[in-house]
């Protein structure tokens, strides 16, 4: 995991973290706010894990050898103290300059905890969908692991058993008939998740969503890249008959598509600036 660039006082700017969110080598954002601060605004920076900042000595070893960005409410004593203890434990740790408040005031994406499924005793969410995934059932797990819960658990079962498995095992069903997370009108499940989690305002994600929507709903005309994604998805499914292995390989496809979307948005912004 590539360390994030920090200033000499072990702080990192919100813009530096924003540019890394969603990338496979993004540092782990650690939400170290107090329970009171979290209750006042129960949303989190995309990709965050929650840990009690003042109890850092009990959990610091989880992040040994990992790159992390710690944030508390204002980026002061709790996050900076927790980051210092993490460095003692062998983590690459910096504190987020200005903390949660600066991120929120900048109007950047925040994910509502209430919109996420229940978590197990390790803080992981569990999801279940139909076996033999193609587009949406790879795109959605990619979105969840990169922006919601990097340790999320995914189950692939017979279509007829998805809802029953969800009920029995406390998992959240998606992209299946009768699930909350499913197609709505012309939109696919990926679109539904983006909107509910407040991620659809990101231009790069919106660009990627058009490709996923076009590929998943049989409308390649809405994005030139959609036909290519269909071909890759079907080819991957034909090549790999293990759904979990297919998911792991599919993550690389969506990492590449998101990197393409980010670069395309940066180029568009630069061209607009030059034209002005």
Language-model segments: what does each one mean?
Residues 120-132, 136-146, 150-274:
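Extended, well-folded catalytic/binding cores that form a central cleft or groove in large enzyme
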Residues 39-46, 60-62, 164-168:
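Short loop/helix-cap segments at secondary-structure boundaries that form the rim of catalytic
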Residues 1-40, 112-140, 146, 270-274:
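Flexible, polar/low-complexity N-terminal or interdomain linker segments that lie immediately upstream
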Residues 56-103:
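Catalytic cysteine-centered active loop of the rhodanese-like fold, especially the PTP/DSP P-loop
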Residues 69-79, 112-121, 126, 178:
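A polyampholytic, Gly/Pro-enriched intrinsically disordered region
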Residues 99-111, 116:
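Long, charge-dense
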Residues 27, 68, 93-94, 152-154:
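Hydrophobic anchor at the start of a short beta-strand
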Residues 50-52:
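Short acidic-hydrophobic, aromatic-tinged amphipathic segments that line or gate anion-handling sites
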């Amino acid at each position: 995991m590539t360390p994030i660039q920090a200033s000499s006082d072990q702080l990192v700017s919100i813009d530096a973290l924003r540019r890394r969110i969603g990338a496979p080598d993004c540092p782990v954002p650690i939400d170290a706010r107090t329970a009171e601060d979290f209750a006042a605004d129960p949303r989190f920076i995309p990709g965050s894990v929650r840990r009690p900042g003042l109890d850092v000595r009990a959990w610091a070893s989880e992040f040994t050898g990992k790159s992390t960005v710690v944030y508390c409410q204002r980026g002061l004593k709790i996050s900076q103290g927790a980051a210092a203890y993490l460095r003692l434990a062998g983590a690459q740790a910096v504190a987020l300059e200005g903390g949660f408040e600066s991120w929120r005031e900048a109007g950047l994406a925040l994910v509502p905890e209430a919109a996420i499924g229940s978590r197990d005793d390790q803080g992981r969410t569990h999801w279940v969908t139909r076996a033999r995934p193609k587009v949406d059932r790879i795109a959605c797990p990619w979105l969840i692991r990169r922006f919601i819960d990097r340790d999320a658990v995914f189950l692939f079962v017979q279509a007829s058993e998805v809802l029953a498995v969800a009920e029995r095992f406390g998992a959240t069903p998606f992209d299946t008939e009768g699930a909350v997370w499913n197609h709505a009108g012309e939109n696919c499940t990926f679109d539904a998740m983006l909107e509910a989690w407040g991620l659809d305002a990101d231009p790069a994600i919106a660009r990627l969503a058009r490709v996923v929507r076009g590929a998943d709903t049989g409308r390649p005309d809405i994005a030139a890249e959609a036909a290519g994604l269909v071909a890759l998805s079907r080819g991957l499914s034909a090549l790999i008959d293990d759904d979990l292995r297919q998911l792991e390989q599919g993550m690389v496809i969506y990492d590449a598509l998101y990197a393409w979307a980010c670069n395309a948005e940066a180029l568009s912004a630069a061209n607009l600036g030059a034209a002005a």
